[in-house]
Amino acid sequence: MRIVFKIGSNLLETDEGDIDLSFLSKLAEGIKKLHSFGDKVLIVSSGAVLSGAKKLGIKEKPKDLTLKQALASVGQSYLMHLYDTIFSNYGLKVGQVLLTKDVFSKEKEERFKNAKSTLEKLLELGVVPVINENDAVAVEELVFGDNDFLAVYVSFMVNADLLVIFSSAGGLKDDKDRIIPVVEDIEKVFKYVRGTGTSFGTGGMRSKLEATRLATTLNIPVIITSKEENILDLRNLKTKGTLFKPSKRKLRNALKVIATLEEPKGIIVVDRGAQEALKAGKSLLPAGVVSVQGNFKRGDVVSIQNEEGLIIGKGKVNFSSEEIEKIKGLKTSEVRKLLNTTKDEVIHRDNMVIFL
């Protein structure tokens, strides 16, 4: 079994503002036991900026990107020192892997393959990879959303069987502040989202839910839970937090690539009727298109967004943005006459992945 643990900055910090060494010890002990079952474990760990701030005596979350990157440079080595020291007490070896967003790009496929090969070799050697975004050189500001999405991309890269996201919230809570034990339809629980991140984190529950939605679409189960969780229970999908069940629709690899590695060139906004049709496995027809954002050509990948602003899918378009502007809202028969084409769909269902 392959398990990815995602640890945010807030989980690494105690109430007193120190690095939580006891949690890292508990995690190492749990991973040691998982190894005894033959499981492979990877850690996606935030905390470089937090660790750098602790080392330099900075108490407030930095707003300046250059300062963040400088703190990440100082903090990443200290963070890995902590992992190495604590995990070695349990006979575990760790390996640092720093990634940037362009690793997960179809246009730079060799970087993806190289990163995957490195992670596979580390796992083969019995090493626990500790993965973080390379904040010190990132061009865009912390683009992975407190590493929630990075954890999903890594899970996809290594064909993980489970993604565990540790959260100070302990799981997804309903409107009465009760943890929801199991979620099968993630669209229905977005209404419970609250929080935009902690002092040194950039995520929050919305980021975690959006990342979880992508993971479950990729057929990866996700658990959001607290750091008090029993590590061994997790491998059996038992949790005191929230278990998000994977989608029942099995995606072929080409669609998984669209969902993860293809950078969208634009956005197509659809109405409620089209959203329900897409959820039911139908193609996207011009009649359901409300508007188009960006400039793209035929064959490009775009994001599909509902009228509430939620990204609900991605897919390869049969028409350019200019053509879709002309045919949006029209019936199929009208489209054929206007564009002199035999194609009916803006995006065919075979070239589309829906996150609902």
Swiss-Prot record:
The chemistry this enzyme catalyses reads:
L-glutamate + ATP = L-glutamyl 5-phosphate + ADP
In alphabetical order, the GO MF annotations are: ATP binding; glutamate 5-kinase activity; RNA binding
InterPro entries listed in its UniProt record: AceGlu_kinase-like_sf, Asp/Glu/Uridylate_kinase, G5K_ProB, Glu/AcGlu_kinase, Glu_5kinase, Glu_5kinase/COase_Synthase, Glutamate_5-kinase_CS, PUA
Its Enzyme Commission number(s) read 2.7.2.11
Q: Please list the residue ranges annotated as the PUA domain.
A: 265-342
- Write out the residues that bind ATP: K6, T202, G203, G204, M205, R206, S207, K208
Top-rank taxon of the source lineage equals Bacteria
Which biological processes are named by the entry's GO terms?
A: L-proline biosynthetic process; proline biosynthetic process
Give the UniProt subcellular location, in the record's own words: Cytoplasm
**Associated pathway:** Amino-acid biosynthesis; L-proline biosynthesis; L-glutamate 5-semialdehyde from L-glutamate: step 1/2
**Cellular compartments per GO CC:** cytosol
Q: What class of enzyme is it?
A: transferase
Q: Which residues bind substrate?
A: S46, D135, N147
Q: Which CDD domains match?
A: AAK_G5K_ProB, PUA_G5K
Keywords per UniProt: Amino-acid biosynthesis, ATP-binding, Cytoplasm, Kinase, Nucleotide-binding, Proline biosynthesis, Transferase
Q: What's this protein's family per the entry?
A: Belongs to the glutamate 5-kinase family.
Explain the purpose of this protein.
Catalyzes the transfer of a phosphate group to glutamate to form L-glutamate 5-phosphate.
Name of the protein this chain belongs to? Glutamate 5-kinase
Gene encoding the protein: proB
